[in-house]
């Protein structure tokens, strides 16, 4: 397996406070990695650095072998799905949003895409009544699951997941975690304290303290 995400001696500070301190690590293709850290410890900054929303004070970030910089960042973002606990999906009707997403998939037969959509809706427990809702009326957990469905339809294979199971019940938490972990070719970097991730033997756990990894 080769590296999909690499942090090379990253230093990052805000208002004089060190957030990341000479941090180096890699996430290989297909790995599922969970980051454990206290609030305000810089874990969300990891995602911002990968997506190019932040630049490190020192060091380099690579995605799929490419340096993350202003020249590469737009192409890199097209390959990544970022889903957080407060995901915004805009306004309007769910069917309209899903139709729009399906039309973006120009390289796959539409009938096959619609079949995949129905399978995803069923797996993530979206019944017909929920699908008819306005987007703004969805609960936090429904928005999280819908964002996952959209990311899968758009064929992302690198997922940055920030507390993505936080608003779900125990059964759905497990279904979401199992869904990602079962996809051997998907690379996932996850921020979570949820046991459904931490207790799975297929998941690698990194603990971030004082800007560095701790054993």
Protein language model annotation of sequence segments:
Residues 152-153:
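ABC ATPase C-loop
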Residues 92-109:
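Q-loop/switch helix immediately C-terminal to the Walker
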Residues 59-68, 76:
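Conserved ABC transporter NBD signature motif
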Residues 148:
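Hydrophobic anchor residue at the start of the ABC signature
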Residues 134, 163-164:
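Walker B catalytic motif
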Residues 5-7, 20-22:
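Conserved structural motif at the start of ABC-family nucleotide-binding domains
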Residues 134-138, 142:
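Conserved ABC ATPase signature
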Residues 51:
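Helix-to-loop junction immediately C-terminal to a conserved catalytic motif
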């Amino acid at each position: 397996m080769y590296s999909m995400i690499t942090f090379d001696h990253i230093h990052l500070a805000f208002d004089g406070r060190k957030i990341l301190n000479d941090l180096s690590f890699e996430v290989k293709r297909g790995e599922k990695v969970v980051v454990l850290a206290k609030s305000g410890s810089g874990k969300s900054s990891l995602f911002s650095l990968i997506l190019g929303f932040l630049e490190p004070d020192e060091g380099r970030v690579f995605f799929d072998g490419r340096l993350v910089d202003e020249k590469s960042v737009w192409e890199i973002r097209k390959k990544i799905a970022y889903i957080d606990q407060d995901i915004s999906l805009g306004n309007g009707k769910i069917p309209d949003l899903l139709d729009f997403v399906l039309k973006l998939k120009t390289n796959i037969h539409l009938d096959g895409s619609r079949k995949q959509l129905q399978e995803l809706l069923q797996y993530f427990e979206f019944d017909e009544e929920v699908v008819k809702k306005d987007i703004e009326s969805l609960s936090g957990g429904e928005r999280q699951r819908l964002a996952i469905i959209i990311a899968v339809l758009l064929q992302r294979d690198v997922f940055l997941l920030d507390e993505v199971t936080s608003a779900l019940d125990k059964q759905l938490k497990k279904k979401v975690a199992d869904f990602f972990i079962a996809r051997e070719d998907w690379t996932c970097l996850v921020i979570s304290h949820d046991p459904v991730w931490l207790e799975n033997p297929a998941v690698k756990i990194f603990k971030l303290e004082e800007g560095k990894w701790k054993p």
